[in-house]
Amino acid sequence: MAFSKIDLRNFRCFDSLSIDLSCKSSLFHGKNGCGKTSILESIYVASSGRSFRTSNLESLIKKGAEAFNIRAYDDNTGSILEVNKAKTKPINIKINNSKVTISELVRAFPSFSIDSKTFFYNDNAPEYRRKQLDRGLFIASSDYSKDWFGYFRSLKQRNSALKLGDIAQAKAYDPLLVDHGERLNLLRENLITEVKEIYDEIVSKLIQENKRAD
């Protein structure tokens, strides 16, 4: 699914704003501080339930307001997405008036944020690189989320058993950790291979264009 229109209310610096996104690509321009990044942030919040700027969603509520509201529309499917975040309350997400989880939202409206950190991907901390990789795989593969949650659930239970000194119980989780871990690594390797092929193709085209320009 893709957004064709998005309406904002009490989000960041905006009292009310409606944006047409029906074109294949959109360009936002304006002076510093006018809210360009906030528009991009609102689209990301609408498609992921999270912000790429802060972990505190309450800070996105316009000063003096009690909540922010985002409504996004997909003309191709007729779907209407609504995201509400009130102070001291958890985020509330609905698709066609039915409440959904963040994982369901991400699958319905897959998106990926390319920001300043992305340009220095290899220089960033391993945790950041894993998160970016995991997000792409969560969107691309339903099996990945099953194995990801299975792996960390088994790891948590294994660590709890170790804290209690129950070595036999801890060892019982080893096969699950190995099984889920191997599948996670395979999916990650496959994604990296696919991305490398696309990257090599783009670089090859750029080299050819530069040669023609010379």
Residue ranges of model-derived segments:
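Pre-NBD coupling/linker segments of ABC/ABC-like ATPases
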Residues: K211-D214
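Regular, well-ordered alpha-helical segments
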Residues: V45-S48, S160
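Alpha-helical structural signal
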Residues: K36, L40-E41, L57, L133-D134, ...
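Nucleotide-state sensing region of NTPase/ATPase domains
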Residues: S47-Y128, L137-A140, Y144, K196-S204
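Pre-Walker A-like glycine/lysine-rich segment at the N-terminus of P-loop NTPase domains
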Residues: M1-V45
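Short hydrophobic/aromatic segments of transmembrane alpha-helices and their interfaces
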Residues: S42-I43, P110-S113, P175
